[in-house]
């Protein structure tokens, strides 16, 4: 059964690779680890943290520490028309996409693809092909979320904070079948209440974080993008970082690296995938409505 599950996932990955190459001209290896973040572009959903991981991996590859297999970081998102920082995050991701594709030392191992005009048609290809489901919002900010459920149902393994429906997924699949990181909701709320979070302290105290954030305004990036947009995002992260990207960044990198290592045990990864599919039944509309009726509506069958 696990071999059949692997084969189905591989077919879906090949179909997505074909779609991306036809529509965007970017070649993706179907044997890659498909790391996917698809959702509304918002600071609290922290696509910017995923982008900072990409910068970290970029430096790793340049230093000769190559991944076991290629890693395409796939994004699908749209921002509200007047949401300036969200558009700056998209701009950063697109600059990194171009940078990686242009560097022959990097592109065989690491790519970013932000699909154009993300919509339901793209979701129908992305969700079944996903290996790593990025659900990395700041704890306490996600009301629930349903994208994580769709990806879970299609055999993706979640990388996430203990936020929103990730908490329920964690309880359903067990710790060995989900990868969690980051501060808890209680810790985050305490930092807000005390007004004690200072991203500049993390930036100044951690050379790795400083290097990654500084790269946003590196001359390589400025050559590809708009210095105003990149500079604005840089200042936002160092000076404010309201959604605490820098706070969780190092643990996020470590957890994702553990996932990539665990992916190499293909049978065990397929088992994790199968557990996620099986446990996704909890989120069915039938069970939900039955629960509402039992606890709220109290209607009787005729």
Predicted feature locations:
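Contiguous, well-ordered alpha-helical segments that form the cores/surfaces of helical PPI scaffolds
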Residues: 39, 121-131, 149-150
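Conserved aromatic-histidine-acidic binding/catalytic patches
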Residues: 4, 8, 29, 39-42, ...
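Catalytic binding pocket for nucleotide-activated donors in carbohydrate/polymer assembly enzymes
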Residues: 128-129, 136-273, 277-287, 291-302
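Short coil/turn segments at secondary-structure boundaries
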Residues: 3-8, 18-36, 69-72, 109-110, ...
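Active-site-proximal structural scaffolding
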Residues: 9, 13, 34, 44-50, ...
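C-terminal, helix-dominated tail/subdomain
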Residues: 74-77, 131, 185-186
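N-terminal leader/propeptide and maturation segments of large enzyme subunits in energy/redox metabolism
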Residues: 1-21, 201-208
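Long, K/E/R/D-enriched contiguous segments that form extended
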Residues: 13-123, 138, 298
């Amino acid at each position: 059964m696990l071999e059949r599950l692997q084969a189905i996932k591989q077919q879906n990955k090949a179909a997505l690779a074909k779609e991306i190459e036809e529509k965007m001209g970017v070649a993706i290896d179907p044997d890659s680890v498909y790391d996917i973040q698809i959702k509304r572009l918002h600071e609290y959903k922290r696509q910017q943290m995923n982008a900072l991981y990409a910068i970290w991996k970029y430096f790793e590859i340049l230093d000769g520490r190559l991944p076991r297999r290629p890693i395409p970081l796939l994004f699908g998102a749209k921002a509200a028309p007047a949401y300036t920082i969200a558009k700056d995050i998209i701009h950063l991701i697109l600059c990194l996409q171009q940078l990686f594709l242009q560097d022959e030392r990097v592109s065989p191992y690491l790519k970013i693809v932000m699909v154009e005009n993300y919509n339901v048609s793209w979701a129908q290809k992305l969700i079944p092909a996903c290996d790593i489901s990025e659900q990395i919002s700041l704890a306490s900010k996600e009301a629930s979320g349903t994208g994580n459920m769709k990806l879970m149902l299609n055999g993706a393994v979640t990388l996430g904070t203990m936020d929103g429906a990730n908490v329920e997924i964690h309880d359903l699949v067990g710790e060995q079948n989900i990868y969690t990181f980051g501060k808890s909701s209680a810790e985050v709320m305490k930092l807000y209440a005390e007004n004690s979070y200072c991203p500049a302290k993390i930036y100044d105290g951690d050379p790795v974080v400083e290097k990654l954030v500084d790269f946003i305004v590196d001359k390589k990036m400025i050559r590809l993008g708009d210095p105003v947009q990149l500079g604005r995002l840089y200042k936002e992260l160092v000076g404010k970082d309201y959604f605490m990207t820098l706070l969780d960044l190092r643990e996020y990198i470590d957890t994702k690296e553990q996932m990539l290592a665990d992916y190499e045990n293909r049978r065990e990864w397929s088992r994790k995938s199968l557990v996620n599919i099986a446990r996704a039944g909890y989120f069915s509309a039938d069970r939900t409505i039955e629960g509402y009726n039992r606890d709220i509506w109290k209607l009787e069958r005729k």
